[in-house]
Amino acid sequence: MKSRNGPLRVGIGGPVGSGKTALTEKLCKAMRDDYSVAVVTNDIYTTEDAEALVRMQALPSDRIVGVETGGCPHTAIREDATINLQAIAGLNQRIPDLDVVFIESGGDNLAATFSPDLADITIYVISVCQGEEIPRKGGPGITRSDLLVINKKDLAPYVGADLEVKDRDATRMRASRPFVFSDMKRGDGVSSIVSFLREQGGL
């Protein structure tokens, strides 16, 4: 069901340890039976995330490409996305029927954003463990991503995080933009994210 405009490109960003790779894995497994899916991962000096997705059997290895960004990973998704665009072009050439390509950024900060030339839809992932105040700190990832995922909700009692406070702050900071609480370890929230991609991405 390939679009005339090419595959839907979904950018997945967030700080180190927030659960980006776990989310990418769950989305691939949830969507691969209905759609033709591929992944591009970004790491500074390795292709570790790509290798992890292969080990997790998220997709066949020929559908997963790891790029080494070197230096600052933010540049490869924003100011100069050439390396990622080339990786997507290579996937399109090898797999002409692609419906969705997930682009997982390297670990970044709250100011990181995806170039509109690279991603059609952006998902930003934060972890409950990173502090109760993270949603209200703002930054483009929090305020402007198409979907905010607040992950590891199951750990809230152990790190002293109040989910009601996070809910209130996310609602205030994002205005009408959607957000989801998730627990990727158990798969909680994945179906809501898939539904969002289907609706907003026209799948």
Swiss-Prot record:
Keyword Nucleotide-binding: yes
Any single Gene Ontology cellular-component annotation: cytoplasm
Superkingdom, taxonomy of origin: Bacteria
Signal peptide residue numbers: none
Subcellular location: Cytoplasm
One GO biological process term: urea catabolic process
Molecular function as annotated in GO: GTP binding; GTPase activity; nickel cation binding
Keywords associated with the record: Chaperone, Cytoplasm, GTP-binding, Nickel insertion, Nucleotide-binding
Positions with a binding annotation for GTP: 14-21
Family: Belongs to the SIMIBI class G3E GTPase family. UreG subfamily.
Function: Facilitates the functional incorporation of the urease nickel metallocenter. This process requires GTP hydrolysis, probably effectuated by UreG.
Subunit structure: Homodimer. UreD, UreF and UreG form a complex that acts as a GTP-hydrolysis-dependent molecular chaperone, activating the urease apoprotein by helping to assemble the nickel containing metallocenter of UreC. The UreE protein probably delivers the nickel.
Protein known as: Urease accessory protein UreG
Gene (UniProt): ureG
